[in-house]
From Swiss-Prot:
Pathway: Lipid metabolism; fatty acid beta-oxidation. GO terms for cellular component: cytoplasm. It comes from Erwinia tasmaniensis (strain DSM 17950 / CFBP 7177 / CIP 109463 / NCPPB 4357 / Et1/99). The keyword Lipid metabolism applies. Belongs to the thiolase-like superfamily. Thiolase family. This is 3-ketoacyl-CoA thiolase. The gene is fadA. Keywords: Acyltransferase, Cytoplasm, Fatty acid metabolism, Lipid degradation, Lipid metabolism, Transferase. It catalyses: an acyl-CoA + acetyl-CoA = a 3-oxoacyl-CoA + CoA. Its main location: cytoplasm. Catalyzes the final step of fatty acid oxidation in which acetyl-CoA is released and the CoA ester of a fatty acid two carbons shorter is formed.
């Protein structure tokens, strides 16, 4: 079976969804820009030799509808002979895109693929057009479809206090701001043109949503966002609303060698699991455990972790039950996470994987694990190994 390697990985800056830098930029343009950028950064790859494009997107309607993967590929002027498909596993969509492409390569159906994902949450809100089947109420609580309330449930079950959530949220912003200041995101961000507050076209090469001034004290002043009476989860301890895209160029190991391309890492294992929708945020725990089992590794073998921060209230129980609380500042979300950078749904899996690869290289870690929760009760994880 072919080994799957990551040759390159990039992302856009994360733009603020409400009146932010990308308010006049469409999701297809963000996607096409990254497709073009990957190919221009790797000129030995003939676009016509791409076997497929797998692109994650959750809200597949309006500008994100009608197979945005193909629309973006056409905008990027990739040859018409190259197919493209849009993948939807809610929050795990672009990581699922990576898994789908990797399997195609493993079994010999592909040699070179572009994968990635996008979500413009300013143009297509998360709840746009959602219409759950009434019959679901017989099996699933209505609150299970309300992500903030599932986070509240996990906080109660695991004894995660409001103060713990606010401290973790402040850490996310502080670490993301420090990473930006130190230039640690420069290796992964590809500049994109957007518009400033006055509508003037501007080149953006840094994330717009990070709030460096965030403190525990400022977060403690916020009201609960989902349970106004007994809640502990606030807007400040939830992932920010942002717009963005991320992408990777992946190949079989033999194809990369044939083209003289240096592989940054290989996929060691992949896993997807289901869990109770009422605690959907717990999905990273069983997903990570299964991915580690398939890789023949233990949690101690992993040098760096990226765990998507949908909510501090769900991230902390996962960190606790994975046995990482005492390693938090050594191994977990070292450049901050989605609380600071935002969680553009279809983008995030590729985004955290891209950030993980750069952290693995910077810290000379052999193994890294990226994992995320998924709405309605799933988890997804990928173990990467540097080559």
């Amino acid at each position: 079976m072919e080994k799957v390697v990551i040759v390159d990985a990039i992302r856009t800056p994360m733009g603020r969804s409400k009146g932010g830098a990308f308010r006049h930029v469409r999701a297809e343009d963000l996607s096409a820009h990254l497709m073009r950028s990957l190919l221009s950064r790797n000129p030995s790859v003939d676009p016509a030799t791409l076997d497929d494009i797998y692109w994650g997107c959750v809200q597949q309607t309006l500008e994100q509808g009608f197979n945005i993967a193909r629309n973006a590929a056409l905008l990027a002027e990739i040859p018409h002979s190259v197919p493209a498909t849009t993948v939807n596993r809610l929050c795990g969509s672009s990581m699922q895109a990576l898994h789908d492409a990797a399997r195609a390569i493993m079994v010999g159906d592909a040699r070179t693929c572009l994968i990635g994902g996008v979500e413009h949450m300013g143009h297509v809100p998360m709840s746009h057009g959602v219409d759950f089947h009434p019959g679901l109420s017989r099996n699933v609580a209505k609150a299970a479809g309300m992500m903030g309330l599932t986070a509240e449930m996990l906080a109660r079950m695991h004894g995660i206090s409001r103060e713990m959530q606010d401290r973790f949220a402040a850490r996310s912003h502080q670490r993301a701001a420090a990473a930006t200041q130190a230039g640690h995101f420069a290796a992964e961000i590809v500049a994109v043109c957007g518009h400033d507050a006055d509508g003037v076209l501007k080149r953006y090469d840094a994330d717009e949503v990070i709030r460096p001034e965030t403190t525990v004290e400022s977060l403690m002043a916020l009201r609960p966002a989902f349970d106004p009476v007994d809640g502990t989860v606030t807007a400040g301890s939830s992932s920010a609303l942002s717009d963005g895209a991320a992408a990777m160029l992946i190949m079989s190991g033999s194809q990369a060698r044939q083209q003289g391309l240096k592989a940054r890492a290989r996929i060691r294992s992949m896993a997807v699991v289901g869990c109770d929708p009422s605690i959907m945020g717990y999905g990273p725990v069983p997903a990570s455990q299964l991915a580690l089992k398939r890789a023949g590794l233990s949690i101690a073998d992993i040098g760096v972790f990226e765990l998507n921060e949908a909510f501090a209230a769900q991230t902390l129980p996962c960190i606790k039950d994975l046995g990482l609380m005492d390693k938090l500042d050594e191994k977990v979300n070292l450049n901050g996470g989605a609380i600071a950078l935002g969680h553009p749904l279809g983008c995030s899996g590729a985004r955290i994987s891209t950030t993980l690869l750069n952290l693995m290289e910077r810290r000379d870690a052999q193994f890294g694990l990226a994992t995320m929760c998924i709405g309605l009760g799933q988890g997804i994880a990928t173990v990467f190994e540097r080559i």
